[in-house]
Design a protein with these regions (language model features):
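Electrostatic cytochrome c docking/interface patches
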Residues: 27-49
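Bacterial N-terminal signal peptides
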Residues: 12-23
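Gly/Gly-Pro-rich "capping" loops immediately C-terminal to redox-active cysteine motifs
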Residues: 40, 61-92
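Flexible coil segments in periplasmic/lumen-exposed cytochrome c-class electron-transfer proteins
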Residues: 33, 102-144
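N-terminal secretory signal peptides that target proteins for export/translocation
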Residues: 1-9
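The canonical Cys-X-X-Cys-His
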Residues: 46, 50-61, 113, 117
C-alpha cells in the first residue's frame, strides 16, 4: 500500500479510535435515584407522623394544604432540596416545623418524616433507616 492510500485511511482510523475510546468512558446516568437513604418501614412511620403534624398545612397529597404550606413533592421539592444534602432537609424540618411548635417532635420522628418525603419524591427505600442525627447525614446527597 502506498503512502497516499495510507493517508486516506487516517480519518477512518481516527473515527474508529474515537468511538472505541468514547465508549470506554463512563457517563453518569441521568435521573437515576440516589442511593437508598431510608427504610420502607421508616417512611410508613413518617406517613403517620405527617398526618398528625403536617397534613393541615401541606395537604393529604403533600401539595394541597388547607393553610397554604408549600408542596413537599414534585418540582418544588426538587428545586428546593434536590441539589442539597439530607442533613440540610432534616435540619430545616427539625428546626422550623411544625410552625406552631418547631423542633418539638423527637429526632426519630423528624427522620421518619424526612423518609416519608423522600419516598414521595422517588427516592427508593433500602435496608437501613435514615439516622436521626444531622452529623451522620452530612454526606447523604439528594442529588440524582
Amino acid at each position: 500500500m502506498d503512502m497516499i492510500a495510507r493517508l486516506g485511511q487516517l480519518p477512518r482510523l481516527a473515527l474508529t479510535a474515537a468511538v472505541l475510546l468514547g465508549s470506554a468512558i463512563p457517563v453518569p446516568a441521568q435521573d437515576q435515584p440516589a442511593a437508598s437513604l431510608y427504610a420502607a418501614a421508616q417512611a410508613e412511620r413518617g406517613q403517620a407522623a405527617y398526618r398528625q403534624s403536617c397534613q393541615d398545612c401541606h395537604g393529604s397529597s403533600l401539595d394541597n394544604g388547607e393553610f397554604g404550606g408549600p408542596p413537599l413533592k414534585g418540582g418544588y421539592f426538587r428545586t428546593r432540596w434536590g441539589q442539597g444534602s439530607v442533613a440540610a432537609l432534616y435540619g430545616y424540618v427539625s428546626l422550623a416545623m411544625p410552625p406552631d411548635r418547631p423542633g418539638q417532635l423527637s429526632p426519630q420522628t423528624y427522620a421518619d418524616l424526612v423518609a416519608f418525603l423522600l419516598s414521595n419524591n422517588g427516592y427508593p427505600p433500602g435496608d437501613k433507616e435514615l439516622p436521626p442525627d444531622q452529623n451522620a447525614q452530612q454526606n447523604m446527597s439528594l442529588k440524582r
